[in-house]
Amino acid sequence: MKKNIIFGLIIVSFVLAGCKQDVKEEKEASTEVTKELSGGQEEVTETATEKLSDMEGVWTDYVEYLDSISGATMDIQKQIEVFAQNRDKWATDIDFADEQYKFTLADLDMDGQVELLVSHSGGTGFFSYTSFYKVDKDGKLKELDTTFSEYESQPDLMDSVSDESDVMVYSNIINGKGYYNYIVYDLMKESPSSYVYRVSSLAIVDDVVTETKLAIEYETYEGPDYEATISYEDYNGTELTEEEYYAYAAAYYDAQNAAEHQAHFQWKDVSDIVNASDEEAIRMLTEVYNAYSFN
């Protein structure tokens, strides 16, 4: 009997020792991986995936991960409430380029934090201007910086005849960070006989709305027959054909191995929300956010 007990204790000790060794090996492996990641983060993230579309099947986990590192702890509805309660800061009177004055909501950079876009356009030069807002980690309204040049026309984000607009988007991952590049256009009238039509992309980079200028079209009307002279070039000054101009954005981001998407926006007149109650303002903001889609 005593021998059996001793034998049993020996077996138990071997089992426990094996478990301890497994835990030790697992811990060492974990430490090794951590060291590898901390020592070569850029290399790992660059080769892990180059397209956001490659992450299909783990998208929910990825979004949750982005939320965790961005500090996006406030849910969408609470963010909308902050926009509604602070509309005196963004739904203000304007005295120029006011033929259209609208707002919409979207998660432009897919980080769980909603952006409020307030845009207005008009005037003889067809100028457009847009302000971008978000709710910061403290629950306060924050206007985002942009790379737009002061006093110059900005991209036309609204449709000139509809409250709906569709935008092509190219997404890619650089050093482990997702970038969403929205292809936008801007029509400007430089003189009674000359127009400029340019294409660029917008992306939010570290809370800055960043414009990448891509290509430009010049139209000049001269002579008794008002005949058009049209030319195209990229922003490096390289001459383009008409076909190259219209395909320029796609070719530019295809060279970066970016994935193609489409975003849909719904816009509402700012005048509709100025004198609305908080409840009605929340309803309107929620409506435009629910109409937003990204595929």
Q: What are these model-derived regions, one by one?
A:
Residues 20-22:
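Bacterial signal peptide processing site
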Residues 25-26, 43-44, 48-68, 170-295:
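Acidic, small-residue rich beta-repeat scaffolds with periodic aromatic anchors
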